Regions:
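Short amphipathic alpha-helical segments
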Residues: 14-38, 72-75
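Glycine-rich beta-strand-turn "strand-cap" elements at beta-sheet edges
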Residues: 38-50, 75-94
Length: 94
């Protein structure tokens, strides 16, 4: 099993718009129905107003890799380019 903590460092003042765009595209709804996905949840950082945290858990790496090749993932990349300054990923395998 693997969990990724993905911190999106949004452009100043863009976190709410980024999150709304993610919701409008159905990123989470699509992802939670993919094979091997156990968790795909967003969290707002209380002390970092421009950060959005995604915690995603997968049963195996191959299925997470498949997620990264979906059309919805490609659309996510376009949103990141528009709304985010950078992204940091912490990966945990267990």
């Amino acid at each position: 099993m693997l969990t990724w903590n993905v911190t999106y460092h949004c452009k100043p003042g863009q976190r709410a718009d980024f999150y709304q765009a993610l919701c409008s595209l159905g990123i989470r709804e699509n992802s939670i129905h993919e094979e091997g996905n156990l968790k795909y949840d967003y969290f707002f950082a209380a002390e970092a107003p421009d950060d959005l945290l995604l915690v995603e858990t997968w049963t195996e790496q191959a299925l997470q890799d498949a997620h990264c090749s979906t059309e919805i993932f490609a659309q996510l990349q376009a949103l990141k380019a528009r709304y985010c300054d950078s992204v940091h990923i912490d990966k945990f395998n267990y």
